[in-house]
Amino acid sequence: TDIFTLTLHDALPISVADVVNNDTSINGKIKVVFIENYRVSNAEWIFAAADVSEQISTASKEASGTGNMKFMLNGAPTLGTMDGANVEIVEEVGAENAFIFGLSSDEVINYENNGGYDPNVIYNTDEEIRQVLMQLINGTFSNDTELFRDLYDSLLNTKNTDRADRYFILADFRSYADAQKRVEAAYRDEKGWAKKALLNTA
């Protein structure tokens, strides 16, 4: 059910946080925090503190909201798909001041209408993606190796009318990882990053 799926989606970041935050080799360098009760009072802190605004819904799937604009107005460049209000943000600040990745809306709709997308091809040819998915079921994030099995299966196996990887997560994964590298390189350029932040605020 959707409620069951949402519960799993809550459990996964909590489990990832537990692993990452207890890894002494990266202590003090990175920390994963999962905010369970996202509300306006929490959002105000996040908008002001963020260096990057990640808006990563699958193109054509997200209603246009205002959260990404609030990040933008606080100087956080957008890392995201061309979906929802991200389209307007890129039009305003320019593609060079955002970090866009993933399938376009037209590509997503074409796959949905005409087929041709098989996440297993990606799984079988991209070792990094395969490793990430295997971590869902090999005990990396939970001693219960079945806890995230349904999530793993949903990405690779069609079940009844539920198409495998219906949100094209594996299709966007490599592009997302590359976008993260672009963010890292841009952030190291302090003046360039400050310019991006100011243009987003303006």
Q: PLM features: what roles do these ranges have?
A:
Residues 18-22, 52, 59:
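Conserved helix-loop functional segments at active or binding sites
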